[in-house]
């Protein structure tokens, strides 16, 4: 099964993915976390942040997630770029696919802007920022949509996710 968590930078994707993984870990040794930033650091040498390069990055994560899920691992993905064609591919090809969309206001995102992406994009210091010069594609039909502005506790959201996904409910510590 693949749980795909998406949202803009700063929406809480990695935080939620880590919380979910940590809740499952004590009773589920076959849960794997794939974070987009970690995958890029490990396998993305020479890959930039333009829209075509972001597609390549997501396709790498998709392929990796499929290989792991085909071996009956529970794969938790935290990945930013959510182009509709890529999400459609996920739904058609990833076993047990469950999509989570973290919807966050720009005020929240800019408040959490650890990478200074949004401030640099506003000032013109950088380009290729999703939500500024690269369009953000809001997922059409996520299995779970979370208002990141309203729900601050990732453990609470991770527990809700476990309750919703029948495959996960037996693994809660």
Question: Predicted regions: what is each one?
Answer:
Residues 11:
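ATP-binding Walker
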Residues 14:
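Walker A/P-loop
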Residues 111-159, 165-173:
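Small-molecule kinase domains that catalyze NTP-dependent phosphoryl transfer to phosphate-bearing small molecules
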Residues 2:
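Walker A (P-loop) ATP-phosphate-binding motif of ABC ATPase nucleotide-binding domains
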């Amino acid at each position: 099964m693949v749980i795909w968590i998406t949202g803009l930078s700063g929406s809480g994707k990695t935080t939620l993915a880590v919380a979910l993984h940590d809740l499952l870990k004590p009773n589920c040794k076959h849960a794997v976390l794939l974070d987009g930033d970690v995958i890029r650091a490990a396998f993305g040498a020479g890959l930039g942040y333009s829209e075509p390069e972001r597609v390549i990055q997501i396709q790498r994560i998709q392929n990796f997630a499929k290989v792991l899920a085909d071996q009956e691992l529970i794969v938790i993905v935290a990945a930013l770029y959510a182009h509709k064609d890529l999400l459609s591919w996920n739904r058609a090809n990833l076993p047990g696919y469950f999509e989570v969309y973290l919807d966050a206001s720009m005020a929240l995102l800019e408040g959490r802007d650890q990478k200074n992406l949004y401030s640099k994009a506003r000032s013109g210091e950088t380009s290729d920022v999703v939500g500024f010069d690269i369009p953000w594609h809001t997922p059409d039909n996520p299995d779970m949509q979370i208002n990141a502005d309203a729900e601050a506790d990732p453990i609470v959201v991770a527990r809700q996710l476990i309750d919703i996904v029948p495959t996960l409910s037996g693994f809660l510590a």
